[in-house]
Amino acid sequence: MATDAFAEDPAWKSKSTEQWNEQDAQAFLAESPWIKHVTPQRLRDLSPDERRNGGNLEAGVGKGVGLAGIGLLGSRRQAEALARAHAKPTPDPVVVRWESALVRAAERKAGETAPAVDDAYYAIVVYDIPLPKRWNIAGELKSVAYLRRTGKKDLKPSRVQILRGENGLATVVYLFRRSVEITRKDRYVEFVAQIDRLFVDPFFDIEAMRVKDELEL
């Protein structure tokens, strides 16, 4: 039984980073404690009053209902129009990475182009999220994101960067100052972020994010 359990461990666990090949790096980036695959939750559309009070009349605007939606074409057409206006497709899954030095090494081995990260920060990166509709919202994204640790004050990002990708997608980089130390005693850290009307909140198992018994954050 012990032999079978050991055989199931991915090859990258038994090698140093320098010994990794491209396949090891890809396996690490597919499934490891630093990598989370999540389906964003979609937030409801804002009412006109909520948009006005927030100072952004375009935020969280749903589809219009047209003439049918106000009942001019009959009750059946009205119900259909309202259903279409409120229907929201399930968001596609995204990847959230805790961009430690180990993760960046894996990205290089795998031939990926990763965003530049200042070592003075913890970096959490959300990949392939729908591109925000406005390009002046980095400050807004910073105000609706944090790292949550049990019994401690939430850690807010110092900076947020929005990087345009392909096919209407974006990479969003969240930078948290390392002057607030995260330790093994924190056990689990929840990353919470809202991007437009989408919301992600994966948990990271800090105890598992170790290499040779040293935290790799």
State where each predicted segment sits.
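Boundary at the C-terminal end of the N-terminal hydrophobic targeting segment
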Residues: 2-7
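PEST-like low-complexity, intrinsically disordered acidic/proline/serine-rich tracts
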Residues: 8-217
